[in-house]
Amino acid sequence: MQNNGRPMTAIPGPSVMPDRVLQAMHQPAPDIYGGRLEAMTEVIVRDLKAVARTQHDVALYISNGHGVWEASLVNVINQGDKVLSLASGRFGSGWADVAKKLGADVQLLDYGVHEAFDAEQLAAILADDKEHKIKALTTTHVDTSSSIKYDIPQIRKILDDVGHPALLMVDCIASLGCDRFEMDAWGVDVMIAACQKGLMTPPGMAFIFFNEKAKQAHANLTQVSPYWDWHPRTNPQVFY
């Protein structure tokens, strides 16, 4: 498909970049030791938090979405921790697979590609976990492969109603910038996103948003990956 002579690829992502984004790329790389890049980063962080509707932290990575699947997990779980994963498509199950390869004890609830999660089943599983062995619940907001959108506030309500402290972790790679997402109002503890879909910029960057509860989980880790560690990315001693 073409519009005014420029090819338009109508796929979920990488999405078509606006002309002003393409024009902004036609400039030399900035001095990484100068103030311009640091000032730009401050604006990017501010605007990302506005899109995610959060007052909490965001860590920026040179990565694709699969990278922040891993990064988000290694910042909050130890090997052997139990993770409950909801999936209605290949990306929900893909995140679960990464958790499993990192050594987590993963329970995958796979609902196929035609249905969202079963609220009664989810509530029963969480209520049965009396010892709170489940440390995190992972899910997509929208799974690209199936287009199924999950009701994130409902998942938060289920967690709260049964009094379960598991971290609520949400993949918004396909939805951030396309649909409303209220990280703070919906009680999401960790959210991941990338730049090439709803944010309509070139592929290559991904983001983890996390709140105080997630910070506490991070503080309790026995080990964290030095590259993926979000702490130096949000509290740098120097900018480089």
Task: Give residue ranges: language-model regions.
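Conserved active-site segment immediately N-terminal to the catalytic lysine
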Residues: 184-196
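Conserved N-terminal alpha-helix of the aminotransferase class I/II PLP-enzyme fold
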Residues: 24-71, 94-100
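Active-site-proximal loop->helix
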Residues: 94-105, 112, 123
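Conserved PLP-anchoring active-site segment centered on the Schiff-base-forming lysine
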Residues: 77-93
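Active-site C-terminal subdomain of aminotransferase-like
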Residues: 16-17, 196-240
